């Protein structure tokens, strides 16, 4: 570049000499003033070269420039404006040539030609002058430069450009083009004090204008004294559409969609069941005097009512245990009276028990039958069904024995039970024997939580029933109830526990069991009932090939037997072929319909998730449909397929009330009767005591 420039400079000098007349015509004064002025108007003169026709004009300009450089005229220009000399040169230069190097400068401004500009700076000012004198033709050979006069040329004085380029070398962190550049200005960095050398001085002069307006910025959130007082009711209503503060006053509260009960209840449930429950319970108390009203009340009040109400309800309604509404067709209303969840549990259990009890003993349990009636009526179409309202309370009362805690637990379990227990479809009325068919109606299995409570509730009702069902009693000794008492039994509604005929006995037993366990808390019941060996799950579900002593089970107990001969009315054989769901094995299986509706209780579905009753057949929760709970639970048995009763040895009386077959525990009600064992002593209030391991154990563990 330097060589080229020198050549150009020499050529220019020659041109100047040869065209001295031209330069003279410009006149040195002109050159000084006029030429300077021309350079000053660089933009306009920039277009001159092309207009002037090329070289002559260019030469003239160049002469002016070069002459100025060498003569006083140039010094005049520079002296006028220290920047102007260079500016003139650069302007003319770019103006002269279509591709003046000044283009480079302007580009450099765009940060394109920094290196070039540095190289140019390296060249002496004389070189620059020479550059200014470059011939247009030589320059025109340069390609890629902007055409002069296209408006892109730099308007900035060269001096400034040069100063920017060369003299000032920016640090990496200050050079915007360098990735290491650290911004030190701008809103985001106004508090960044890292490189604060001149920062504070520089900032103020730069920009004083605000980029945004703060005026109304916090209007929406300003503290206003007049807004600090509580709003009036009118204001609240205007704001929210209702008075958000009046939670006690339902009418004032914003109308909301009525939520389903947490556990969902069968649709049949009476929408007003909540209100009804109380009425019914009172009614039952009155009607079923036998049942202690307090039991029902306690259960309900404490939420323990689940048992009482649920029994009746579940029986009749087969409500889903956990559901707020009870299945019971009638139960809807009946159950309604009880507390929602507890009632449900209780309803299902109680209804089963009551139904059984009622069916067995309609007179004392007219109310109970009513409880069971929805399903009872369907299954047995028992007169007791007529007393649906009255019936539910009695079962609830039986709950009284249950402790509140038990009721509460039961309730809690209800949700599980609902999931686990399937309702057993009510058998046809014909299926159920003369005894109230409440059992027949499959009570939906009570939720696991509810099973115990229902038994208790049944207990009160059962007591009545038992009194009336002395017959049943014969089979079931009070002792039986005790074995039944174990929460399994308790948990099972009587109706479930007992077969259609046997249910009365079963009720009796249950009663007894309840009495035994009545005082017991749910927790104690949850413990393995004292009665005999803890049964595996209370699946007393009828196991194939297992025989249940009729005495033991009031309801038909199925057992797989070789001979199909039916057992005594109270005893029932379950065919192996029968689909009695094993409570543990087949959670939601529904048993096949019994061949003898009268003989066999309606199928009971057992929810597998329910805790198995520990002692008796009757699981606290409803056993799987196949499970027999005390007598004829409502388990359906395959009709006509009664296997011959298994040998009695299966259930030796001497043996503990429970035997386990195939993972199912079967209890011999008769034996259990004999064993009036009350439920195990109540557990201490704290369900589990956690003690630190003895030091030895600890040391072992550590070692």
From Swiss-Prot:
GO-annotated cellular components = cytoplasmic stress granule; cytosol; dendrite; exon-exon junction complex; nuclear membrane; nuclear speck; nucleoplasm; nucleus
Write down the superkingdom of origin: Eukaryota
The encoding gene: CASC3
According to UniProt, the name of this protein is: Protein CASC3
Residue spans with biased composition (Basic and acidic residues)?
Answer: 109-119, 127-138, 158-178, 211-234, 245-255, 341-355, 413-422
Regions of biased composition (Gly residues) lie at 29-46
Q: How does it assemble?
A: Identified in the spliceosome C complex. Component of the mRNA splicing-dependent exon junction complex (EJC), which contains at least CASC3, EIF4A3, MAGOH, NXF1 and RBM8A/Y14. Identified in a complex composed of the EJC core, UPF3B and UPF2. The EJC core can also interact with UPF3A (in vitro). Forms homooligomers. Interacts with STAU in an RNA-dependent manner. Interacts with DHX34; the interaction is RNA-independent.
User: How is this chain modified after translation?
Assistant: ADP-ribosylated by tankyrase TNKS and TNKS2. Poly-ADP-ribosylated protein is recognized by RNF146, followed by ubiquitination. Ubiquitinated by RNF146 when poly-ADP-ribosylated, leading to its degradation.
Q: Where is this motif: Nuclear localization signal 1?
A: 204-210
Q: Share the domain note from the entry.
A: The coiled coil domain may be involved in oligomerization.
Residues modified as Phosphoserine are 35, 117, 148, 265, 363, 373, 477
**Protein source organism:** Homo sapiens (Human)
Annotated region (Necessary for RNA-binding, interaction with MAGOH and localization in nucleus speckles) at: 137-283
The record's region (Necessary for localization in cytoplasmic stress granules) falls at 377-703
Q: What is the effect of changing residue 181 to A?
A: Does not affect EJC formation
Tell me one GO biological process term: mRNA splicing, via spliceosome
Q: What is its subcellular localisation? A: Cytoplasm; Cytoplasm, Perinuclear region; Nucleus; Nucleus speckle
On tissue specificity, the annotation reads: Widely expressed. Overexpressed in breast cancers and metastasis, as well as in gastric cancers.
Cited InterPro entries: Btz_dom, CASC3
Residues covered by region (Disordered): 1-462, 492-538, 633-703
Residue positions of motif Nuclear export signal: 462-466
**Composition bias type Acidic residues, residue spans:** 74-84, 93-108
Q: What is the effect of changing residue 218 to A?
A: Abolishes interaction with EIF4A3, EJC formation and localization in nucleus speckles
Taxon lineage: Eukaryota, Metazoa, Chordata, Craniata, Vertebrata
Coiled coil: which residue ranges?
Answer: 95-131
């Amino acid at each position: 570049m330097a060589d080229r420039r020198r050549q150009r400079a020499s050529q220019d000098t020659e041109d100047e000499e040869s065209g001295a007349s031209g330069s003279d015509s410009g006149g040195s004064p002109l050159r000084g003033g006029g030429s300077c002025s021309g350079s000053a108007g660089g933009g306009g003169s920039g277009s001159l070269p092309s207009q002037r026709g090329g070289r002559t004009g260019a030469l003239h300009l160049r002469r002016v420039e070069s002459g100025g450089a060498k003569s006083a005229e140039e010094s005049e220009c520079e002296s006028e404006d220290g920047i102007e000399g260079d500016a003139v040169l650069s302007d003319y230069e770019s103006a002269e040539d279509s591709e003046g190097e000044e283009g480079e400068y302007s580009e450099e401004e765009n940060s394109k030609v920094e290196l070039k500009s540095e190289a140019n700076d390296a060249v002496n000012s004389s070189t620059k002058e020479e550059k200014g004198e470059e011939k247009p033709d030589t320059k025109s050979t340069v390609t890629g430069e902007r055409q002069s006069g296209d408006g892109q040329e730099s308007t900035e004085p060269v001096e400034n450009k040069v100063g920017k380029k060369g003299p000032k070398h920016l640090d990496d962190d200050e050079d915007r083009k360098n990735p290491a550049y650290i911004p030190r200005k701008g809103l985001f960095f106004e508090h960044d004090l890292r490189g604060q050398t001149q920062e504070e001085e520089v900032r103020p002069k730069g920009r004083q204008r605000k980029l945004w307006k703060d005026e109304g910025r916090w209007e929406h959130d300003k503290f206003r004294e007049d807004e600090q007082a509580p709003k009036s009711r009118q204001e609240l209503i205007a704001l929210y559409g209702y008075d958000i503060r009046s939670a006690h006053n339902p009418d004032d509260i914003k109308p909301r969609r009525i939520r389903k009960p947490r556990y969902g209840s069968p649709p049949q449930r009476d929408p007003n069941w909540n209100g009804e429950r109380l009425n019914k319970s009172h009614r039952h108390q009155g009607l079923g005097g036998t049942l202690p009203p307090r039991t029902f009340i306690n259960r309900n009040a404490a939420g323990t009512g689940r048992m009482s109400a649920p029994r009746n309800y579940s029986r009749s309604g087969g409500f889903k245990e956990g559901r707020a509404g009870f299945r019971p067709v009638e139960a809807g209303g009946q159950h309604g009276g009880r507390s929602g969840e507890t009632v449900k549990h209780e309803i299902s259990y109680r209804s089963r028990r009551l139904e059984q009890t009622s069916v067995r003993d309609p007179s004392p349990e007219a109310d109970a039958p009513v409880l069971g009636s929805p399903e009872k009526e369907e299954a047995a179409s028992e007169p007791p069904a007529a007393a649906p309202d009255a019936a539910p309370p009695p079962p609830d009362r039986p709950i009284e024995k249950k402790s509140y805690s038990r009721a509460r637990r039961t309730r809690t379990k209800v949700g599980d039970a609902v999931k686990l227990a399937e309702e057993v479809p009510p058998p046809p009325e014909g299926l159920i024997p003369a005894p109230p068919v409440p059992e027949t109606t499959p009570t939906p299995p009570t939720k696991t939580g509810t099973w115990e409570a229902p038994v208790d509730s049944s207990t009160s009702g059962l007591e009545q029933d038992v009194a009336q069902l002395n017959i049943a009693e014969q089979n079931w000794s009070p002792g039986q109830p005790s074995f039944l008492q174990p929460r399994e039994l308790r948990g099972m509604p009587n109706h479930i526990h007992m077969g259609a005929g046997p249910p009365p006995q079963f009720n009796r037993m249950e009663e007894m069991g309840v009495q035994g366990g009545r005082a017991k808390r749910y927790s104690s019941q949850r413990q393995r009932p004292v009665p005999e060996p803890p049964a595996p799950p209370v699946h007393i579900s009828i196991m194939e090939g297992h025989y249940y002593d009729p005495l033991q089970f009031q309801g038909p107990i199925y057992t797989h037997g070789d001979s199909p001969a039916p057992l005594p009315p109270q005893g029932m054989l379950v065919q192996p072929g029968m689909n009695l769901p094993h409570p543990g094995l087949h959670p939601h299986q529904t048993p096949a319909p019994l061949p003898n509706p009268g003989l066999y209780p309606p199928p009971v579905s057992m929810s597998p998730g329910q805790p198995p009753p520990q002692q008796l057949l009757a699981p606290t929760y409803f056993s799987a449909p196949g499970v027999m709970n005390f007598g004829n639970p409502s388990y359906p048995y395959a009709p006509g397929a009664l296997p011959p009763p298994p040998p009695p040895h299966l259930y030796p009386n001497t043996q503990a009330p429970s035997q386990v077959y195939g993972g199912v525990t079967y209890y011999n009600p008769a034996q259990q009767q004999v064993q009036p064992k009350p439920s195990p002593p109540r557990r201490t209030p704290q369900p589990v005591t956690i003690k630190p391991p003895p030091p030895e154990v600890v040391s072992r563990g550590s070692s």
